[in-house]
């Protein structure tokens, strides 16, 4: 007797779930070889060379773009060695002075800005003059 469609569908979903890779599988694999990658980079090897070797030896199974993004995120983005905090100076450095914006006076006439010079060259006029047309 043939299986019903729902039984076939249930088997297919289960087999597909078993084959489906985890999203973080590449990150976990990279973190497992992170120390090796750091040592190889410190020795002067290129990132693509390190990835090719690890791919051939089976240490990583993901693309170079993924490898590169994990290297950037987990190795190259680390902050540089921060020096030990020094004792605070007795006087803090003076803050740079910024000029205060000019405000118009409350009473009297408000200053009018100087009219801008007429632009030279082409200017678009949406309502053309009849005399300017051919």
Curated annotation (Swiss-Prot):
Composition bias type Basic and acidic residues, residue spans: 99-112
Assigned keywords, A-Z: Plasmid
Pfam family for this entry, one: DUF5338
UniProt biased composition (Low complexity): 83-92
Cited InterPro entries: DUF5338 (IPR035225)
Region (Disordered): 74-134
Record's protein name: Protein TraK
Taxonomic path: Bacteria, Pseudomonadati, Pseudomonadota, Gammaproteobacteria, Enterobacterales
Gene it is expressed from: traK
């Amino acid at each position: 007797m043939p299986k019903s469609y729902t039984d076939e569908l249930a088997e297919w979903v289960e087999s597909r779930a078993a084959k489906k890779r985890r999203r973080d599988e590449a990150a976990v694999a990279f973190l497992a070889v992170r120390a090796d990658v750091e040592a190889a980079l410190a020795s002067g090897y290129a990132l693509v060379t390190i990835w090719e070797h690890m791919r051939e030896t089976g240490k990583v199974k993901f693309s170079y773009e993924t490898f590169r993004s994990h290297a950037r995120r987990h190795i190259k983005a680390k902050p540089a060695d921060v020096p030990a905090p020094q004792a605070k100076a007795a006087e803090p450095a003076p803050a740079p002075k910024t000029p205060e914006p000019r405000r118009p006076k409350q009473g009297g006439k408000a200053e009018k800005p100087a009219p801008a010079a007429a632009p030279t060259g082409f200017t678009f006029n949406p309502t053309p003059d009849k005399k300017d047309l051919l």
